[in-house]
Amino acid sequence: MQRSLVGSEMCIRDSYKDVRLVGTPPASIGAFGGDYDNWGWPQHKGDFALYRVYADREGRPAAYSADNVPLKPRRVLQVATGGVHDGDFAMVIGFPGRTNRYASSFAVAEKQCVRNPIVVANRHDRMDILKRHMERDPRVRMEYSDAYFGLSNYADYAKWENKCLRRFDVVAIREAEEERLQRWIEADSARKAEDGTLLEELARGYKARQGAERNLNYFREAWLGPSEALLVANRVSSYLGKLERLKQDSLIVDSKDARSVVAGSGRLRRNYDAATDRDLLARMVVNFTANVPREMWGAQLQAMYDKAGGNADRMARAAFDASFCSDPARYDAYFSKNRSVAEIRRDPMVALTESVTVQRFTGGVDKAEKRGRARVGRSESRYADVLYDFRASEGLAQYPNANSTMRLTYGSVQPLNPSDGVHYDSRSTIAGYMEKYNPDEYEYRVDDRMRRLIAKRDWGRWGENDTLYVNFLTDNDITGGNSGSPVLDGKGHLIGLAFDGNRESMAGDVWFHPELARTVCVDIRYVMWVIDKYADAGWLLDEMKFAK
């Protein structure tokens, strides 16, 4: 905080870019339970990592240098050692990514009926392929584990979001609110003149774009990310477009502009397995051609599909095998000399990516779809403003949607009753961790050192009631982007780290359920025990401050 000349105050944010990894637990601690336990309870994850921020000798931000020193901030969070219990105050400070709690009933219905089913089906297909290859080869497991978790995380989210939207009948709740909203609009002549047809316009817009939205989601799932080779081809295609705009008909390999494209095989040298990528491409192309109208494919894809006798799987595999974009050695050899734009465009993977373009799917193929998409964009924005004012008029406390800016959510440690006859305690223990131990399941493996330490039951000052608490639940309101956010008690002391939500609250993007929403946190005492006892890194604790 710096004081200006006129006496007011202005916030100044410094960005420290020299941030170094100090340590992180193995997957058998940090990711214990894997995607099986994801969004579930009880969990037993030691999900944390330690970083140290470096600065110049005056404590100012600086680029990486061997001369930099650890930053010594004036204030740091103190670590609480007393543990948590039901009803204890808890607040989370972090950077939640996005919510859409002013979405119309039409938007919620579209998500529930169009987007989420497509996401779940396609990502489970990709997960099946990854799992098969990961089980075949430990190297592939290492290279694709992050990708697999990302797919699992979002697929599970979409699946449970739909279950929650149906369970709580969120569309019907929004429709009932919109009936009251319409009456409120019509009760005032100025409001009626400006927004009297707002809901009608939304209904028309969503109906007009229904098919386009379905096609767009299949496009996203098939062409934006599953195949690294296809991403390489897309990068090449983008550069060809640049050459055309410059009225150049050849790629000169030693030109400054072309160097990034010539070096593009680097993407195929990191976390890439050709056999895996080939299967991913084929599966997504099959899904795309089976569900998207032929007129949306583009001429090249249509021709390649027909040449393969209508066999999309065979077509995709043949394109992959013949392309320089799928093999780093082939790529480097191809761009070892100058190439004409026309010649490069004959590569089958480049032809695929140029045939199926994002503009075709975001713009729509007819005027009705284009008008529908434009109408929805304008009307949803206005709808959010009007709904905000309407809810405020009903005395409801309002707050803006999450947008990756810092937010604070407050609540308390709470158990969970997710359904009839089912009760979950608010805390999980090390006993549950060992109950799940299974040496034959990668996600539930426990290494020898961890098993020996647990058998000794030496919890030090981190234990309570002759056990070690691992995770706990709060009723805080978080979303994607909050992972790693500090969880504080009423004195501002660190009691844990938020890392997950629960399945029963997955409608939280559009509708928050206060009785069922839970934040899953790692108990800070478990973090300290792992550092102290498992890692035998007690010197790191000397750098921390502990609440008395």
Q: What residue spans do the PLM features occupy?
A:
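Short, structured beta-strand/loop micro-motifs enriched in basic residues and often containing a Trp
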Residues: A66-V76, L408, D475-I478
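Charge-dense, extended regions
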Residues: D254-V470
